[in-house]
């Protein structure tokens, strides 16, 4: 329908852009290559504090690559090369002096497929806290609080110290992974297709949770489900062929998109 060259001829369409003072993360002219293949093209965007930002677009458009750039998960891919800046609370996380492991302690991530450890529910959530040196009653208090925030506590409170996280249902496992991520109080939580492997009831529980989480955290979610993006997000980014085509308030993107390619995707004419 459209060539990369045509997309790159035009700047990103922005509606109500996020002021620098309200941004937790400020991406500046970010490009990324896997070997010789370029996956992201000169992306600049800000992610506002205590809001949910959804990233949408057809398969292979660079959604997950952009998401994983926000906590340097792409560093784990052989041959990756990055140009540009990702400022997290004003610090460029790609500065050579910055430890990527330290970055990931501040930025939690929840993956497409739940990945609980083969440990008890308690030990799953306690894992990151123990690495931080949290012990004793404080450790238990923070585990319980994280399970409550992840809307899992009432379902597991009678067995969380003895039952393996692997015995939970898929939806419960995903909420356990969210509890594990938020236990260490990361200001930023990244979610890569967090409900794609779940049934509708479990999906609803995760969506309700996302809306609650933004009171304490900044959330960025990648989703193929446009209805989900419309339900849970405050702002939406539309990507195509590694280019950020349009960004703005979710209501604008879904009801009055300004770029013809955004409108074509939203109305189902491609993707």
UniProtKB/Swiss-Prot annotation:
It holds the Pfam family ABC_tran. It is a peripheral membrane protein. Its EC number is 7.3.2.1. Residues 25-266 form the ABC transporter domain. The keyword Nucleotide-binding applies. Keywords: ATP-binding, Cell inner membrane, Cell membrane, Membrane, Nucleotide-binding, Phosphate transport, Translocase, Transport. It is found in: Cell inner membrane. One of its GO terms (cellular component) is plasma membrane. The keyword Acetylation does not apply. It catalyses: phosphate(out) + ATP + H2O = ADP + 2 phosphate(in) + H(+). GO terms for molecular function: ATP binding; ATP hydrolysis activity; ATPase-coupled phosphate ion transmembrane transporter activity. GO terms for biological process: phosphate ion transmembrane transport. Part of the ABC transporter complex PstSACB involved in phosphate import. Responsible for energy coupling to the transport system. NCBIfam families: 3a0107s01c2. The complex is composed of two ATP-binding proteins (PstB), two transmembrane proteins (PstC and PstA) and a solute-binding protein (PstS). PANTHER family: ABC TRANSPORTER I FAMILY MEMBER 17 (PTHR43423:SF1). This is Phosphate import ATP-binding protein PstB.
